[in-house]
Structures are given as C-alpha cells and as structure tokens.
Amino acid sequence: MNEERRQLEHTVKTRVRYGETDQMGVVYHANYLSFFEIARTELIRLRGVVYSALEEDGLRLMVTEAGLEYHSPGRYDDVLAITARLAGSGPARVRFDYEVRREGEDEVLVTGH
C-alpha cells in the first residue's frame, strides 16, 4: 500500500460488548454506525484535526447520509477491525467509506459510507 493511501485510511479495533448485541449474540445493526464514528474520528485525529477544535472555530462535520451493507454477522466477543477511508471531498462535503472485519480475517462483515 502506498504512503498516500495509508494516510487516507485508518483501522481501529474494538471488542464487541454484550450490550452491543441482540438476543442472538449478533451485533445490533445500528451499532456499526458508532463503530464507523470511532474509526472516522481517529482517522481525522491522525491527520492533526480534532473535532472539538473545529467546533471552537465554528465548523461542524455533520453526517448527512449513511449506508450499510451487511455481508456476515459480527458476534459477541469478536474483535472487530473497522477501517475508515477518505473516499472523496468537495467544497462542503467529505465522504468516508468503511469496512468491518474480524481481527485477523479477510472476510468483510459490513461495508458502509
């Protein structure tokens, strides 16, 4: 992977907690949006930007669209690797894409934007 692309993506890991699952031990679908936010925030932080500093300057980063595609379930106690990737930007818009995998596995569980 080239250096420029590496700077435009970041992967964080989190262990699925019991409260993030449904009665069957599967990650509740809406929790992936929280996982995406964690990865996105850390990617931005690595680029030297902190949300609170943006807010102090009167800027807000609002989510105006979110989409997820479920390929395979995450389960209680899985360690998930969530990758956020800067997919595009414009004068008033930034787009991030996401992939979720179990740590150490190639299978993509969830993709999103």
Map each language-model feature to its residues.
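Hot-dog-fold acyl-thioester-processing enzymes
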Residues: 2-64
